[in-house]
A protein has these predicted regions:
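C-terminal catalytic lobe of FAD-dependent flavoproteins
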Residues: 1, 218-220, 226-252, 328-410
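Beta1-alpha1 glycine-rich phosphate/pyrophosphate-binding loop at the start
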Residues: 1-71, 157-180, 377, 381
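Short hydrophobic core segments
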Residues: 5, 96-106, 147, 228-238, ...
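Mid-to-C-terminal Rossmann-like scaffold of FAD/NAD(P)H-dependent oxidoreductases
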Residues: 7, 20, 276-378
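Residue-level detector of alpha-helix initiation sites
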Residues: 8-12, 34, 107-109, 128-129, ...
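A Rossmann-like FAD-binding core segment of flavoenzymes
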Residues: 24-26, 66, 72-90, 96, ...
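Glycine-rich dinucleotide-binding loop and its adjacent helix/turn
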Residues: 105-163
Length: 412
């Protein structure tokens, strides 16, 4: 009996790997949400009104679970693992046995202990239900404050803006998307957001969510005393691995659940994959959280094969972010902005007026990272250069050319 906790992309990857080889082994999938697997990256399209719920829920065929002989249990949250008896226990007291277990529970919103965080009309934005709540209330409000200028914050802001809401974004760092952008690219996207009417406050620390005296939100107060009005507040500072129950069971954790190259934890027969897992990072072969959709699927497949005795090795993920904001496409990957720039080389082409920026980061004549804004064509080639550790010294002068392509690569 294989039991999978979590019903998103990593769990789906595991199911498909298992069923490719073994059509009969019992699989139970347990999810605390009421939905079949859906495309979490596109909940922002739902909020914008560009995607219906049916589209989100079509990540896999309607009969996917039946066709793959999967016992799907919805609205059931697992809160404990009994390692000795090989069973998991839900909040409602139900027990599910396993011979092999995959933890694919993803992440949960990180909520700092702000005063006022429990007021009415304080939201998060990581699930379809979150998007439904924001879409519903957007028709009755005029202003929103989004705390956090990362991917989740910007996509929630874009969705609310599309519904006619005046949005203010508050970000602690000196730029939005601080993990994906450097200062120049962050500034370009900030300018685009300002052009469409979104206010962006960087290097701004939220001190309190303000009460209107009736238990409702009226805005936030920053350190220093400045107040920003809002009928709702979206807390979008980031996510943390949803793994407290795993820690209780003795599973080793750092920031996430630590796994080996087979996606197995320190407890034999228990695996982890996706946003909850801390796995090998490709570039430096160190373990880290990589909350990236394709990598979560890949990790799930590796775990699935290994759970049925077919050895597969996870070769590591690459930090990568791809996002379109208000018509400006962006993608970044790898170590594009190292903290210590010594020993690195940077190739840069920028046109801020046209919202365009290309930065390629090299070390020892190898591409280790890049940021593209506005023009993201051929990004896949650069991902390949990073993963294959190609020496680019013979064609380095061509890397920034608009028509750079496979024809420019060495033949061998």
């Amino acid at each position: 009996m294989i039991t999978i906790i979590g019903n998103s992309v990593a769990g789906i990857g595991a199911i498909e790997a298992i069923r490719k080889v073994d059509k009969q082994r019992p699989i139970t999938v347990i999810s605390k949400e009421p939905y079949v697997a859906y495309g979490r990256p596109v909940i922002s399209d739902f909020l914008k009104g560009k995607a219906k719920e049916e589209k989100l829920l079509s990540y896999r065929r309607k009969d996917f679970y039946k066709e793959n002989n999967v016992n799907l249990v919805l609205n059931e949250e697992i809160v404990d693992i009994d390692v000795k008896k090989k069973k998991v226990i839900s909040a409602s007291g139900n027990e599910y046995k396993y011979s092999k277990l995959l933890i694919a529970t993803g992440g949960v919103p990180f909520i700092p202990p702000f005063k006022g965080k429990d007021l009415k009309n304080v939201f998060t934005f990581t699930t379809l239900d979150d998007a439904k709540k924001l879409l519903s209330i957007s028709k009755d409000i005029k202003k929103a404050v989004v705390i956090g200028g990362g991917l989740i914050g910007l996509k929630s802001a874009e969705g609310l803006h599309a519904q006619g809401v005046k949005v203010s974004i508050v970000e602690l760092m000196d730029r939005i998307l601080s993990l994906a952008f450097d200062k120049v690219s962050g500034s370009i996207v900030e300018n685009r957001m300002s052009d469409v009417g979104i206010d962006v406050y960087t290097e701004a620390s939220t001190e309190e969510i303000l009460d209107d005296g009736q238990g409702n939100v009226r805005g936030i107060r920053l350190k220093g005393g400045r107040e920003i009005e809002g009928d709702i507040v979206v807390i979008a500072i980031g996510v943390v691995p949803n793994a407290s129950f795993a820690k209780k069971a003795g599973i080793e954790m750092n920031r996430g659940i630590l796994v080996d190259d087979h996606m197995e934890t320190n407890i034999k027969g228990i695996y982890a994959a996706g946003d909850v897992a801390e796995a090998k990072q490709f570039l430096y072969e160190q373990k880290m959280l990589l909350p990236i959709w394709p990598d979560a699927y890949k990790q799930g497949r590796v775990a699935g094969y290994n759970m049925i005795g077919i050895e597969r090795v996870y070769d590591g993920g690459l930090a990568m972010n791809s996002i379109e904001l208000f018509g400006v496409s962006t993608i970044s990957a790898g170590a594009h902005t190292p903290q210590n720039p010594e020993g690195y080389e940077f190739l840069i082409d920028v046109d801020e007026k046209r919202y365009r920026y290309r930065k390629i980061t090299l070390k020892d004549n190898k591409v280790v990272g890049f940021i593209f804004v506005g023009d993201i064509d051929r990004a896949g080639i650069f991902v390949g250069l990073i993963k294959d550790k190609v020496d680019v010294s013979s064609f380095k002068d061509k890397l920034l050319k608009k028509d750079f392509g496979f024809i420019d690569l060495p033949c061998e």
